Amino acid sequence: MISLVESARQDIAKGGSQTVEILYSPKPGSSGLESTPEVRPEPGVPLNFTMERVARTGKDKTWGSVLYILARESKAEILLELGACAGVSAAYLSSSEHCKVLHTIEGSAALSELARETLQKITNNAHVHNALFDDALDELLPDLPYVDLAFIDGHHEKVATIHYWERIAPKMRPGGIVIFDDISWSQDMRDGWIHLSQQPQFSHAADLGSIGVCICGGNDSEKPRYWDLQPVLGKKAIGSPHGWSKQAGEVVR
């Protein structure tokens, strides 16, 4: 499985300096300071990433394996991902033998097509939806009986991350896994993770530095049991996203 996914990543990287439009996470505050399920975050800034950069942007082999293990060990059947990028993370998640269907959402039309090409090489149970996250959730959530595993990626802003969680939360099964990506992307995202990791809907929350993993099933009155695994895995420095200094349409290599 790993070799198949990494081979697909190498195929993407072969595109070299060819560019593809992506939506880069906006600066904190672009969507206001308060999160609600109703107020929709602003979309990201369109930038042009080289194919080589896109291949590096997806979760690497180590973190991809972590995603696969979480999907496999939780026996997740219905999976939901926000932020397909080139489809690498979705390929790892949907490779679990328990996965019946994975829905992944991507705002960039070019990345959506790239994700479809990637996933067709790996699995037949992943579906790519090209739309802004909220628009796709409007269509998907009413028809999903439940969600076993949610991977919230793509829009690295505290208010936006909390908003998307609040929309997905009613569909999560007890014992379901929620993975928040890039929790050290910026101080704003770090603050978002700290807030989310204290929510009583979760029974457990684990800080892995790059990602935060929560288990649904709290009693709505107590904070979840919190595990800080950074001393074991290595502390993740708070990022300073380079894309914030770019203008719309600029090329990022």
Feature-to-residue mapping (PLM):
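A short alpha-helical cap/connector motif
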Residues: 1-151, 156-179, 183-253
